[in-house]
Amino acid sequence: MKKLAIIIPAYKPRFLRETLDSIAKQNNHDFTVYIGDDASPYQLETIVDQYKNKFDIIYHRFEQNMGKKDLPGHWERCILLSEEEFIWLFSDDDLMPFDGVARVIQALQKHSGGKYIFRFPLEVVDEYGKL
């Protein structure tokens, strides 16, 4: 079993491909990505299928949309799909640096043995790809 679950609650396809591209470039592949499709009207599975040979990825389509009225509930049901020791809650419009997984696993192992919530530095990129 992999060490890290990367949980991606998903609804819109707009940035999902870029998100998955950034995950595919990781220098540490000790992770499984879980895509929780929040009953999207878009064909998210078609995008996800393009990454099945690049890293471990599991797609699950939920029949009921929860994000509009209970976003934490949607996150929770996505988390319940995973079995890994550590969980990284990601978004379908987030980008990961090439060493993101390695840095997260290193931080989590350094502070193991308790319950922690980590927040890592981020850079905001607009819809045009500018910081």
Q: Locations of the language-model features?
A:
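Glycine-rich, basic loop-to-helix element that forms the pyrophosphate-binding segment
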Residues: E63-S82
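Acidic donor-binding/catalytic loop of UDP-sugar-dependent glycosyltransferases
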Residues: Q43, D94-A107
